[in-house]
Every structure is written in structure tokens, then in C-alpha cells.
């Protein structure tokens, strides 16, 4: 039984990576519909091109809106696992800007 769960999870992740460009467009469009001033970035192993199918897909969203609002809208748009959504204010986002490669979406 657990073998089937692992296979399902791997196939789901494979599909997310195969459709990465489409998913990133959906993320950007959804976030900008809620907050046109928001900035969206890809970071982590995917932005460094060091990922595999067990990697998550890290997304940084810089906005002054409450994170729950962004998470809710992305969930409705179908953005779920393996996407790891990090929502921060501009001040808190400075941490990411100094420690990792950010690729603007």
C-alpha cells in the first residue's frame, strides 16, 4: 500500500516539474490579481538547477497582504505540493535576497 502512495507522489511531482513554466505563470497571474504590486520569485534548488523529483519548488512572494490571503488564492488556483510558498513583507524578504539566488517570475 505505501508503495502505491510513493508512486503517486512521485508522479505528481514529476508532473509539477514537467509543467513548471505553466505553473509559474499561474502563480504570477494569481498573485498579481490579488496584489498587483507583489513580487514573485523562484528560489532554492530549482533556481540553482540542482533539483530532483524529491525537491520542493520554493516560491517567494513579497507583499504587504496577509500570507493567508495569498495561500488561499494559490490553493484555489491549484498550486499545492510540491510548491513551497513563502509569503513575506518587503522587510522580511531582505533575508532571502542576501542568502539565496532569486529568479524573478
Kindly label every feature range from the protein language model.
Residues 1-41, 47-54, 62-105:
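Catalytic core of pol beta-like nucleotidyltransferases
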Amino acid at each position: 500500500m505505501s508503495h502505491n502512495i510513493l508512486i503517486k507522489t512521485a508522479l505528481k511531482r514529476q508532473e509539477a516539474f514537467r509543467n513548471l513554466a505553466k505553473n509559474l505563470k499561474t502563480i504570477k497571474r494569481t498573485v498579481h490579481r490579488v496584489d498587483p504590486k507583489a513580487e514573485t520569485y523562484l528560489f532554492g534548488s530549482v533556481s540553482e538547477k540542482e533539483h530532483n523529483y524529491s525537491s520542493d519548488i520554493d516560491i517567494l512572494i513579497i507583499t504587504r497582504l496577509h500570507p493567508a490571503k495569498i495561500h488561499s488564492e494559490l490553493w484555489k488556483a491549484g498550486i499545492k505540493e510540491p510548491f513551497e510558498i513563502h509569503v513575506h513583507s518587503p522587510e522580511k524578504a531582505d533575508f532571502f535576497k542576501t542568502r539565496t539566488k532569486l529568479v524573478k517570475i
